[in-house]
């Protein structure tokens, strides 16, 4: 007897949000393991999950069918829709686009009429409701008649008492309507073990606890994939229902591999092809990039790249990116390409990238390779405040029917998973909050039992253990779709005939359902239009330098003076607060050890403080060899296998240590004799080592390949271990070089013009590692005067102002480096109104500037000028009226006394002759502590004093020393330091170590918290805002840390800042909480 065959045609992934309880990949691989012919992915009104299932099955025996469950708004039963060819698939995606664009984000509104308009080439399985009433019979007859031989009736076993009667009824309805029954198991998860999770997400969807869910949950755990034998047994009275599943599969000719969209044609000059136009643009750019002539080496590189671009039919793509960059620059928007595109001389000549790949010997095959056959991927960073202008240009140029932003998947993270699971299981809010509070950062490190115990929870308690297990299952599930940060997909045919397009939350934005990984799997080309805060800061800095300092020669990144020794002096001193990419504690610790003296050193600096080199044990060998503390050893292949210097060619500039992905690929090709295709497979496998372990095929081939060519086995194994490190995020050299450019530019601005640097960084917030309070402090330590927000002189942004009369620049701290030649020309930084919490740029500032221009000085005059009362209160509380002789309390009193909010009040005749506004009264002065507390509450910083200075005597009594004392303490000395917690950082490569930065009135102290100490004091380390760290001094390479042993949380003490004599009248609104300044936490 022939074994049964079966295809599951009703499988729901977790992209049917809060319904499916398995990943698409799990469904596909389980279907293969159980021997199914095919599996059809039919998410609700969505194609978001199908590419993942298709990708997982690409090289396997299981076939994944692309389908969709269409739910209708007009009462028609749902339909499992399967397109039979490419054109039918285009109709389905257009249908879904129509439904999504007419609805709110995340919804899709369709009618049966909509479907009929797009039904050509579609097969449909009609999904019966639970109750088979007369209206369903009418719908069934109509739908089957409309589809004329292309419809079936989906029949599933509900495992209920009346199952067989229901199936018999469906079989009868199918026979009379012309839509015969077909067996499905209406799959919601790949295996029965996922049933509890499906119950939980059903409760989340239905907004109820599991105790009250009742019939809203599935009755059993049978909605999983079943084998052909099991389905044949379940439908033994209706064997044709099982056989029809395979017959339907045979009628479906469409496969996702059929999607190979052409890139849109670009307009070119008359008589020119796209390739000829690209060639002209490239050589024109080469003349601009190389004003002294294009060398033979560069010429050969450009010619080879153009040959490959033509062969692979990519010229239109390069013209597109060139056009976008050209348009951005015409609008005065700073931009720079990065990533693998920096390997291309064509991109460099087109002005897309800023790094000369021939100068740095970068590998073009990392960008484009005919062996890989993958489309190029160009990432371009734009100023983050102006990127939207560039994106709207792309929409306008190509049309929304041909351009859209990639989707991105918002996943469940530990905290959100815990909260949803806790609600579903009926846990109290207190218990759920305690569970969520054990998670560090957004992804955390799971829910270890010791963390639960530290939070006062018993990990063995059944309800806790169950919640933790289900939360761990839910982590990584998709919650909803959103738009990618800037990946554009452009197509020659209508994009909505390739993928559904939906509404984004942002006005005038649309995005597709597939994310960048889906796009890569399908081979579609995209352009990444990304935002980078540092570019915005640099552009603002260059504008200030031209307008305030007369540096008219400075117009572009290329104009920045190159290789200035003072810039490297500053970086070697780890004086890098605010400098792009090298401002973290790890980078600051590395700078004095690496001691950069030229641009390529910055490339190394960017790349070396990454998880890849750290995990691959590359950092210490590189530093020792660079600093001549150990010799560089160059193992050689046997003479018959290659030149003795083959490793030196690959690793010479990094002292024999592979720091970059390109070097790993070259090592595989030259030393282990991988083909370029195999080396690219190794590059891709780097991304999977962390999750799947090292594939033996690559390990063995690499090691045996090197050993077979005469290298020692131990050396070959060490090389592969270093390559494995790249699975933990290592930089390509091209990417590091692009970022190093911005490291140098931002460092030069900080060194030469720290006044401009401070103002530009604050104006570009939010960005970077530090908050305005630390940027201001750093500027003042470099000798820059910083002035508070002022009602008469501030703008929204920070501006440069004349130095105050009597200002005496402080001596620059010994650990701070600045240009002495420009120092006499530095100006003061006037903080802008942006620093005052609650003020609105578009509503509050225009009337304020207008009133000020008309002579307003007092609160009453600004009120008469139309400044809202709320804005005047915020300005008064921020002490912005000091320049007109009003203290904080006096200004607030005056504002509170105004009789009208936006204009002077109309005076009643009875009150004629009385003053319109309250007269000035004598109010008690605020204590210094209160002034500082109010500064922090209103502007997040204070120029008057540092809060910790008020606690110095108390701290001294506890044996706590100021941060500046660390400079004079010996290695190993016991010490206690205290301060506001600025930054908590827990890198994934640090094996549980946490780095904490404290700030007091004398400087900053950096504490290292080893894992055991962190686990013992987890809550204090994670939450304290004012902290004493007790430990020992660690000094190495001019870097000082405190290795923490224990902690004292003083956060509650901060509330005493306002507890001074002289209560405000009227009382300033808010209390100062125990958190003056919110830390920035990184993980």
Swiss-Prot record:
Primary location group: cytoplasm
GO BP annotation list: DNA repair; DNA replication
UniProt subcellular location: Cytoplasm
EC number(s) stated in the UniProt entry for this protein: 2.7.7.7
Enzyme class per UniProt: transferase
Highest taxon of source: Bacteria
One Gene Ontology term of the molecular function aspect: DNA-directed DNA polymerase activity
Keyword rRNA-binding found: no
InterPro entries per record: DNA_pol3_alpha_NTPase_dom, DNA_pol3_finger, DnaE2, DnaE2/DnaE/PolC, DNAPol_HHH, NA-bd_OB-fold, NA-bd_OB_tRNA, PHP_dom
Pfam families the record matches: DNA_pol3_alpha, DNA_pol3_finger, HHH_6, PHP, tRNA_anti-codon
GO cellular component: a single term: cytoplasm
Keywords assigned by UniProt, alphabetized: Cytoplasm, DNA damage, DNA repair, DNA replication, DNA-directed DNA polymerase, Nucleotidyltransferase, Transferase
Induction entry: Up-regulated in response to DNA damage in a RecA-dependent manner.
Keyword DNA repair assigned: yes
Catalytic activity field: DNA(n) + a 2'-deoxyribonucleoside 5'-triphosphate = DNA(n+1) + diphosphate
Similarity-based family: Belongs to the DNA polymerase type-C family. DnaE2 subfamily.
PANTHER family: DNA POLYMERASE III SUBUNIT ALPHA, ERROR-PRONE DNA POLYMERASE
Record-linked HAMAP family: DNApol_error_prone
UniProt function note: DNA polymerase involved in damage-induced mutagenesis and translesion synthesis (TLS). Along with ImuA and ImuB is required for the error-prone processing of DNA lesions.
Designated name of the protein: Error-prone DNA polymerase
Organism for this UniProt entry: Caulobacter vibrioides (strain NA1000 / CB15N) (Caulobacter crescentus)
């Amino acid at each position: 007897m022939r074994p049964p065959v079966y295809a599951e045609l009703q499988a729901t992934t977790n992209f049917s949000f809060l319904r499916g309880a398995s990943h698409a990949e799990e469904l596909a691989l389980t279907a293969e393991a159980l021997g199914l012919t095919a599996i059809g992915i039919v998410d609700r009104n969505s194609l978001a999950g199908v590419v993942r299932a298709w990708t997982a099955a690409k090289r396997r025996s299981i076939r994944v069918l692309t389908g969709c469950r269409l739910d209708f708004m007009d009462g028609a039963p749902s339909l499992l829709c399967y397109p039979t060819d490419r054109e039918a698939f285009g109709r389905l995606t257009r249908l879904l686009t129509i439904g999504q664009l007419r609805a709110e984000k995340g919804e899709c509104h369709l009618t049966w009429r909509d479907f009929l308009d797009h039904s050509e080439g579609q097969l449909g399985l009609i999904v019966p409701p639970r109750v088979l009433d007369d209206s369903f019979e009418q719908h069934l007859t109509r739908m089957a008649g409309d589809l004329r031989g292309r419809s079936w009736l989906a029949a599933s076993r509900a495992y209920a008492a009346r199952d067989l009667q229901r199936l018999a009824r469906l079989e009868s309805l199918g026979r009379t309507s012309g839509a015969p029954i077909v067996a499905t198991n209406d799959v919601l998860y790949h295996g029965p073990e996922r049933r509890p999770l499906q119950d939980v997400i059903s409760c989340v969807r239905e907004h109820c606890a599991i105790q009250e869910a009742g019939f809203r949950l599935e009755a059993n755990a049978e909605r999983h994939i079943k084998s052909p034998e099991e389905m044949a047994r379940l439908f033994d009275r209706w064997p044709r229902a099982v056989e029809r599943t395979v017959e339907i599969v045979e009628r479906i000719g469409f496969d996702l591999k059929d999607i190979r969209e052409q890139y849109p044609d670009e307009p070119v000059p008359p008589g020119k092809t796209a390739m000829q136009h690209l060639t002209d643009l490239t050589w024109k750019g080469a003349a601009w990039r190389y004003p002294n002539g294009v060398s033979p080496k560069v010429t050969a590189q450009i010619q080879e790249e153009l040959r490959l671009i033509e062969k692979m039919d990519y010229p239109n793509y390069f013209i597109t990116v060139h056009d976008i960059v050209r348009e951005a620059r015409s609008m005065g928007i700073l931009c720079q390409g990065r990533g693998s595109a920096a390997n291309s001389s064509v991109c460099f000549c087109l002005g897309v990238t800023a790094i000369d790949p021939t100068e740095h010997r970068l590998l073009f095959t990392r960008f484009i390779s005919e062996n890989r056959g993958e489309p190029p991927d160009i990432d371009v960073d734009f100023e983050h405040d102006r990127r939207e202008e560039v994106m709207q240009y792309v929409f306008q140029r190509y049309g929304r029917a041909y351009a859209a932003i990639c989707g991105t998947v918002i996943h469940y993270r530990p905290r959100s998973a815990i909260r949803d699971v806790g609600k579903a299981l009926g846990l109290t809010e207190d218990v759920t909050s305690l569970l969520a509070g054990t998670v560090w950062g957004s992804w955390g490190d799971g829910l270890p039992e010791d963390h639960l115990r530290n939070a006062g929870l018993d990990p063995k308690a059944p309800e806790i253990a169950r919640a933790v297990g289900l939360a761990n299952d839910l982590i990584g599930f998709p919650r909803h779709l959103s738009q990618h940060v800037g990946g554009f997909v452009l197509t020659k045919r209508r994009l909505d005939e390739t993928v559904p397009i939906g509404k984004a939350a942002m006005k005038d934005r649309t995005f597709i359902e597939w994310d960048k990984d889906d796009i890569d799997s399908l081979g579609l080309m995209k352009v990444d239009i990304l935002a980078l805060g540092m570019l915005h800061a640099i552009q603002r800095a260059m504008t200030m330098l031209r307008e305030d300092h007369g540096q008219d020669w400075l117009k572009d990144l290329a104009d920045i003076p190159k290789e200035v020794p003072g810039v490297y002096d500053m970086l070697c001193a780890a004086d890098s607060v605010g400098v792009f990419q090298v401002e973290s504690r790890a980078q600051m610790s590395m700078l004095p050890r690496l001691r950069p003296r030229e641009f390529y050193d910055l490339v190394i600096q960017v790349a070396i403080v990454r998880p890849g080199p750290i995990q691959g044990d590359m950092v210490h060998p590189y530093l020792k060899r660079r600093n001549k503390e150990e010799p560089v050893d160059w193992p050689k292949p046997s003479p018959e296998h290659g030149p003795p210097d083959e490793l030196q060619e690959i690793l010479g500039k990094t002292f024999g240590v592979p720091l970059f992905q390109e070097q790993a690929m070259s090592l595989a090709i030259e030393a282990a004799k991988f083909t370029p295709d195999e080396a690219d497979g190794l590059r891709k496998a780097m991304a999977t080592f962390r999750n799947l372990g090292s594939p033996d095929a690559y390990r063995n081939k690499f090691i045996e390949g090197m050993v077979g060519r005469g290298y020692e086995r131990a050396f070959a194994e060490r090389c592969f271990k270093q390559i494995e490190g790249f699975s933990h995020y290592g930089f390509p050299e091209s990417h590091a070089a692009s970022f190093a450019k911005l490291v140098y530019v931002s460092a030069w601005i900080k060194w030469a013009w720290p006044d401009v640097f401070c103002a530009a960084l604050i104006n570009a917030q939010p960005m970077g590692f530090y908050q305005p309070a630390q940027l201001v402090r750093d500027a003042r330590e470099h000798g820059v005067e910083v002035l508070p927000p002022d009602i008469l002189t501030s703008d929204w942004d920070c501006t440069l102002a004349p130095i105050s009369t009597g200002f005496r620049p402080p001596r620059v701290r010994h650990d701070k480096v600045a240009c002495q030649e420009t120092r006499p020309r530095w100006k003061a930084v006037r903080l802008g109104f942006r620093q005052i919490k609650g003020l609105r740029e578009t509503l509050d500032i225009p009337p304020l500037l207008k009133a000020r221009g008309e002579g307003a000085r007092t609160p009453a005059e600004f009120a008469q000028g139309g400044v809202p009362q709320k804005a005047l209160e915020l300005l008064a509380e921020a002490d912005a009226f000091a320049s007109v002789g009003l203290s904080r309390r006096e200004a607030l009193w005056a504002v509170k006394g105004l009789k009208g909010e936006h204009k002077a009040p109309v005076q009643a005749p009875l009150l004629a002759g009385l003053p319109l506004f309250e007269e000035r009264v004598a109010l008690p002065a605020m204590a210094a502590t209160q002034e500082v507390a109010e500064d922090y509450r209103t502007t997040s910083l204070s120029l008057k004093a540092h809060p910790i200075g008020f606690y110095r005597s108390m701290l001294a009594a506890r044996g706590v020393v100021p941060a500046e004392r660390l400079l004079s303490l010996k290695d190993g000395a016991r010490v206690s330091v205290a301060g506001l917690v600025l930054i908590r950082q827990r890198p994934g490569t640090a094996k549980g170590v946490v780095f904490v930065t404290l700030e007091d009135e004398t400087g900053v102290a950096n504490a290292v918290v080893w894992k055991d100490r962190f686990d013992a004091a987890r809550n204090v380390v994670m939450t304290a805002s004012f902290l004493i760290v007790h430990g020992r001094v660690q000094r190495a390479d001019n870097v000082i840390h405190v290795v923490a042993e224990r902690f004292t949380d003083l956060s509650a003490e901060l509330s005493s800042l306002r507890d001074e004599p002289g209560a405000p009248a009227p009382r300033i609104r808010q209390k100062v909480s125990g958190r003056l300044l919110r830390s920035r936490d990184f993980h």
